[in-house]
Amino acid sequence: MSEPTPQPTPQTTPRTTLVHLLRHGEVHNPRGVLYGRRDGFHLSGLGQKMAQRVADTLGERDITHIVASPLERVQETAAPLAAARGLSVQTDERVIESANVFEGERFGAGKNALKRPSSWRHLWNPFKPSWGEPYTEIAARMTAALHDARVAAAGHEAVVVSHQLPIWVTRLSLEGKRFFHDPRKRQCTLCSLTTVEFEGDRVVRLTYSEPAGDLIPAHARGAAFSAGGAPEEEQP
């Protein structure tokens, strides 16, 4: 009696998962200070409109998981989308703003902390950088959070609400690019989406969009942080 012919093992197609990295909206910051990880900085009225625009844009998508930095401006950005999707926001310390020795300082034309000789000792290594949390550490914590969000929303979509530099460094890491960069050239404006598409656990595509792009003031597009309500001379 002949042996039965072996049957081919069916191939399982990896599930597609989208993780959207969402930057927070405009911050009420009339003194134009670098707020960093400081408490007490909330969305401005315009920032709230930006957050609602994101909720209107993504509200009908297959989003099953929302993660946010613990800082107020990020929680407030996440809230309208969470309400639209009927989800709770999971707070994750790993997607918090990067640490920076210049927190509380101003960088506008009227008063720029970088012009003080006492600040120059922090500027010796822009590749690390010497003034704040190392890029490698930012990338490591953000990437870990990104993959955890992917697992939590496997086969669906997740949103990770974070900050400009952590999102930009994550993108550079995923694209295999060096971390050293000109902050004015980051493609990560207010309430923008950097979307990472996974097949299984493999990154297959990265796209960028600005659902609230028409609401963003021209001066805010190239700024390293938001200063809603600040006079022109105090804008970063």
Where are these regions (language model features)?
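Loop-to-helix element that buttresses phosphate recognition and phosphoryl-transfer chemistry
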Residues: 26-76, 81, 131-143
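Alpha-helix capping/helix-boundary segments
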Residues: 73, 166-167
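Acidic, low-complexity terminal tails and accessory targeting/binding regions
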Residues: 2-17, 90-91, 97-109, 151, ...
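Generic beta-sheet signal
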Residues: 19, 156-164
